[in-house]
A protein has these predicted regions:
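Topology signature of small-to-medium multi-pass alpha-helical membrane proteins
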Residues: 1-166
Length: 166
C-alpha cells in the first residue's frame, strides 16, 4: 500500500487497507500510552494519559495502595506483582499488534482483550468509583478504540473475501 495522503475511493482495496492500518495503529497507540501511564505512575507523577488500557493501570494503583497501607511503602511486593501482570497484558497487546502485520485476523483477539479491559473499566466505575462521571472521557475513548478495531476487522474481512471495488 502506498503511504500517501491522497483520497482513496470508498470501498476500494486501498480504502480497506488504510482502515486495517488505522486499526493496527490504534492498537499500538493504546500499548504505548499504557506503558507511559505505568511509568508515570511508578515515578510518582500525578499525571494520567487517556487512550490507554485500564486494567494494568488500576491494578498497579490498587497494588501500590495496598503496599502503602500494609507495609508503609517499605515492601513493594504487590506493586511489582501487579507490574508483572501488567507486563503480560501489554505483551499480549504487543503480540497481537506484531502478528496482525502478517495476518489481520490477529486484530480480533486484540479487540476481545480491549473489550474485556473496557468491561472491567465499566465495572470499576459502577462498583469501585461510585459512578461514571469521573471516567466519562476514558469510557468514550474506550468506545472509540473498540469502534476503530471493529472497523479494521470488518475491512480485513472484506479484503480477504475480495469484496472491494477494483
Amino acid at each position: 500500500m502506498k503511504k500517501s495522503n491522497q483520497m482513496v475511493e470508498k470501498g476500494s482495496q486501498a480504502y480497506y487497507e488504510r482502515q486495517v492500518s488505522m486499526g493496527r495503529s490504534t492498537l499500538l497507540v493504546v500499548l504505548c500510552l499504557t506503558v507511559a501511564n505505568l511509568l508515570l505512575l511508578l515515578s510518582n507523577t500525578n499525571f494520567y494519559l487517556l487512550f490507554s488500557a485500564s486494567v494494568p493501570y488500576y491494578l498497579t494503583i490498587l497494588a501500590r495502595g495496598y503496599d502503602l497501607a500494609a507495609f508503609g511503602a517499605v515492601n513493594q511486593t504487590y506493586t511489582w506483582a501487579a507490574v508483572a501482570v501488567s507486563a503480560v497484558v501489554l505483551g499480549l497487546f504487543l503480540l497481537f499488534w506484531l502478528m496482525s502485520k502478517k495476518n489481520s485476523n490477529w486484530l480480533v483477539p486484540g479487540l476481545v482483550l480491549f473489550g474485556f479491559d473496557s468491561l472491567c473499566l465499566l465495572l470499576m466505575c459502577r462498583f469501585i468509583f461510585g459512578g461514571f462521571a469521573d471516567s466519562l472521557l476514558d469510557l468514550c475513548m474506550h468506545g472509540w478504540v473498540i469502534y476503530e478495531l471493529a472497523v479494521s476487522i470488518r475491512a480485513a474481512r472484506r479484503l480477504r473475501d475480495g469484496a472491494y471495488k477494483v
